[in-house]
Regions:
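Small-residue-enriched flexible segments
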Residues: 1-64, 70-71, 75-349, 354-383
Length: 383
């Protein structure tokens, strides 16, 4: 029996090499689909001594051998996800295959040697593409390898307009178009079109410790004062009161108060009482201080997925991609499969994904890099 989407998950029980494990995951995913159009493959190398340095490329080759007519995007990461399951710190692979009847793809692979100054324009153009003959996109999936973890790359994607853009930062990325041999690449961008709707849920794993405060003075990446107090004093006082080992995080307020953009504190200037974050905020921005929190993470993801499910009553989830921060998983929850099971409870559809260095999702109508966030990209069939 064929479907419009298929998934696969494999680990050391299916083989002792990335090639064998990826092959097993892809075979499961492809078997469910009559006419594969796009195939996402995610690998995890586990112990670096056992891992494969070109794991994404190996996976892409295995995928093309089994689905030669599909566009293939492969990425290597600390862990992989499938429906209700996660695999961390071990050799594993997951795969998601979608049928040509529901999704068509325009795939762009950025060369590994592309200079940083070329990342912005190349990614902006890749995200704006449409499959041949299509006038409207469903969404864009962008996976960035380590060499494309650059401000220029993020700026190129931030300016994307139109269909939702999701994705993540991986260690290795590879891609292949039908009839073209797979290549390792700096980034792979799959622009999708078809009779599906893509809905995105981004859920940060944080709990706020302070009220919202105004950035009353800033200098580039440095926040100098918060509500006219030296920012370093505010952070020091909050850290003492919280008495937690977890580092404080800066939460940037958006349109949705309960979905802040999370940033780490990157440094301090004691002379000015300023702190630096990996972002530039205009004066007047509202921020709070917070920490990672497993209960808040679990509850927020479940709540947001429930809201989406109610809003899409009558529409059927067809498939999902999930990108979760590598700072979540067992390290945060003390147990495996938490994010994947939470998604499955509200979206019982073929799923694949990975743990990531950062996540890409819309925030205040702009694509931004997220931290400590679970991003669920759910493809719905119209009611």
């Amino acid at each position: 029996m064929t479907s419009i989407a298929g998934e696969g998950l494999a680990d050391g029980r299916q083989g002792r090499s990335i090639a064998a494990i990826a092959r097993a995951a892809v075979r499961q995913a492809v078997a469910a689909v009559r006419h594969p159009s796009v195939l996402f493959v995610f690998t995890a190398g586990g112990n670096p001594e056992r891992g494969t340095p070109d794991a994404a490329l190996v996976a892409a080759r295995e995928a093309q051998a089994l689905a030669p007519d599909a566009a293939i995007v492969a990425a290597d990461a600390p862990g992989v996800l499938a429906t209700g399951a996660e695999r961390e710190a071990q050799l594993a692979a997951s795969a998601l295959c979608l049928d040509r009847s529901v999704l068509r793809v325009a795939l762009t692979a950025l060369p590994v040697g592309l200079p940083r100054e070329g990342h912005e324009s190349a990614l902006r153009e890749a995200a704006a593409r449409l499959p041949e003959g299509e006038s409207r996109g469903v969404g864009v999936v962008a996976l960035l390898g380590a060499s494309a973890h650059t401000p220029e790359a993020l700026m190129g994607l931030a300016r994307h307009a139109g269909a939702p853009l999701v994705g993540a930062g991986a260690s290795l990325v590879a891609a292949a178009s039908p009839g073209v041999a797979p290549i390792a690449c700096a980034a792979a961008v799959a622009a999708l079109a078809g009779p599906l709707r893509l809905d995105v849920v981004a859920s940060p794993a944080v709990r706020s410790l302070t009220p919202w405060m105004r950035v009353t003075r800033q200098d580039g990446p440095f926040i100098v004062t918060l509500d006219d107090r030296p920012a370093l004093d505010v952070i020091s006082d909050t850290a003492r009161a919280a008495a937690r080992r977890d580092p404080l995080l800066v939460l940037i307020r958006g349109v949705d108060d309960e979905a802040p953009l999370v940033r780490t504190i990157a440094g301090a200037d004691p002379q000015r009482g300023a702190v630096a974050i990996a972002d530039i905020l205009p004066e007047g921005s509202a921020v709070a201080l917070g920490v990672r929190d497993p209960a808040a993470a679990r509850d927020d993801l479940a709540r947001r997925l429930a809201i989406l499910a109610r809003g899409r009553a009558g529409a059927t989830p067809a498939a999902a991609l999930m990108f979760t921060c590598a700072g979540r998983g067992k390290a945060l929850f003390g147990a495996t499969d938490v994010d994947a099971r939470t998604l499955r409870a509200k979206c019982p559809a073929p799923t694949a994904g990975m743990q990531s260095a950062f996540e890409l999702a819309p925030w205040d109508e702009i694509t931004r890099a997220h931290l400590y966030t679970a991003v669920s990209a759910i493809f719905h069939r119209p009611s």
